[in-house]
From Swiss-Prot:
It comes from Bacillus thuringiensis (strain Al Hakam). The gene is thiM. Keywords: ATP-binding, Kinase, Magnesium, Metal-binding, Nucleotide-binding, Thiamine biosynthesis, Transferase. Substrate binds at residues 45, 194. InterPro entries: Hyethyz_kinase, Ribokinase-like. It comes from the Bacteria. SUPFAM superfamilies: Ribokinase-like. It catalyses: 5-(2-hydroxyethyl)-4-methylthiazole + ATP = 4-methyl-5-(2-phosphooxyethyl)-thiazole + ADP + H(+). This is Hydroxyethylthiazole kinase. GO terms for molecular function: ATP binding; hydroxyethylthiazole kinase activity; magnesium ion binding. The keyword Magnesium applies. Belongs to the Thz kinase family.
Amino acid sequence: MNMKEISKVVDLVRESNPLVHNITNVVVTNFTANGLLALGASPVMAYAKEEVAEMASIAGALVLNMGTLRPDEVEAMLLAGKSANRNDVPVLFDPVGAGATSYRTEVARHIPAEIELAIIRGNAAEIANVINEKWEIKGVDAGAGNGNVVSIAKQAADELNTVAVITGKEDVVTDGERTIVIRNGHSILTKITGTGCLLTSVIGAFVAVEKDYVKAAVAALTFYGVAAELAAAKTVEKGPGSFQIEFLNQLANTTSGDIEKYGKIEVI
């Protein structure tokens, strides 16, 4: 897997304009939709249990995000996820805040038990709690802690039979056999709500067009990180508001050439 190979997936997303069905949280809906549009994908936010199965069946990818968790939303996620599985639509799961409360942790473990996942994406604490490994968490954004991130990612990939993506200062992608570390991004991303949630949906757009889910995830993370770096270079001194606007611009303007030039990945 080389940078040229990875960068081509960016062009493929823009050429294909994949439909990404998001059942996401109320905090990030607008930002997620705008980010996907900027990238070149087609977002749809359909939540009603009466329509999610049908919508998921025609999507390029389905993204399930439990940031603002409600019982009716969980029901919709299960209906959509099972429909996606029946129709060979890849499902991505973002277990936001797994470990923060008993209910949230229960749901985070129930969804992978019921739905076949292409990708699970979270911080180290969230992924550890999904697979019942000890890792402290405070609130839905906690990611720091004591533990081996690569080991947790590999364990999650093996136990859940999926590609595990753990994001943080460095990002890890693994299917249990192939493991890649991505070292792009910028710390100002943590000052904008929803950047992690948008990232999962961006990975969804890449997974919709690239069936090697490890390659798709690595391409998405590299693209996202480079876009953040380019946006930060123009706006970081102004603050997070200016960065957010420029980040959307860079999601639209970052090219495959930029990925080849600035991408930083390591196969381990």
